[in-house]
């Protein structure tokens, strides 16, 4: 077992950073050193921002997004199209779609996808609230923005069946060649989907 190179407080910081996705022990150690070197301009303000976030962040009861208010900023936005709902697996997907600037609808976060392997069943997801939201008179379209994985597509089929009794159109994101993507680098599944879902030029 490697020896500690610093006091317990610094080792604790490194251990916590190493729990972050994409950060292993070595990257966590480097990040900790940068924070320590810049403790006045980075570590202190970061610690304060994290303290405030920990105290104020809540989950929106309407859509499942995280924010410092409930309903969240997106649900409060009257400029959003109330007739469309974009269903996503996780908040990170919601944020990614928001960064694209392509969505003017509201969102619904499922909180995961169905997975027999991970033991995630329908009752573990935010599905009851989805049915409630899809049932309002002004709702016209539910857009399933779920992963193109087996579990993602299984979830999409389940949601489609769940909403089949409602007078709403259920659509899904197109799959295919990404903007700027070269065919040589794409996998067979992506190329196959791109051919099947081709559009007029």
Swiss-Prot record:
Keywords: DNA damage, DNA recombination, DNA repair, Metal-binding, Zinc, Zinc-finger. It comes from the Bacteria. Residues 83-178 form the Toprim domain. Gene3D superfamilies: 3.40.1360.10, 6.10.250.240, RecR Domain 1. A zinc finger (C4-type) spans 60-75. GO terms for biological process: DNA recombination; DNA repair. One of its GO terms (molecular function) is DNA binding. Pfam families: RecR_C, RecR_HhH, Toprim_4. Belongs to the RecR family. PANTHER family: RECOMBINATION PROTEIN RECR. May play a role in DNA repair. It seems to be involved in an RecBC-independent recombinational process of DNA repair. It may act with RecF and RecO. HAMAP family: RecR (MF_00017). This is Recombination protein RecR. It comes from Methylobacterium sp. (strain 4-46). The lineage of its organism: Bacteria, Pseudomonadati, Pseudomonadota, Alphaproteobacteria, Hyphomicrobiales. The gene is recR.
């Amino acid at each position: 077992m490697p020896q500690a190179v610093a006091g317990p407080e610094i080792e604790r910081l490194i251990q916590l950073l190493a729990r972050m996705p994409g950060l292993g022990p070595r990257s966590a150690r480097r990040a900790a050193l940068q924070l320590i070197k810049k403790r006045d301009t980075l570590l202190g303000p970061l610690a304060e921002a994290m303290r405030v976030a920990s105290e104020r962040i809540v989950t929106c009861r309407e859509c499942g997004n995280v924010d410092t208010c409930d309903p969240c900023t997106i649900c409060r936005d009257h400029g959003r199209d109330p007739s469309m709902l974009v269903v996503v697996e996780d908040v990170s997907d919601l944020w990614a779609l928001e960064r694209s600037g392509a969505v003017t609808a509201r969102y619904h976060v499922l909180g995961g996808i169905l997975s027999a392997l991970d033991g995630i069943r329908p009752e573990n997801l935010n599905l009851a609230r989805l049915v409630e939201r899809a049932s309002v008179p002004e709702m016209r379209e539910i857009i399933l923005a779920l992963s193109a994985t087996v579990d993602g597509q299984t979830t999409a089929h389940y949601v489609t069946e769940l909403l089949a009794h409602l007078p709403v159109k259920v659509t899904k994101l197109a799959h295919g060649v990404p903007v700027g993507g070269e065919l040589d680098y794409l996998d067979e599944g992506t190329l196959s989907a791109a051919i099947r879902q081709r559009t007029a030029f």
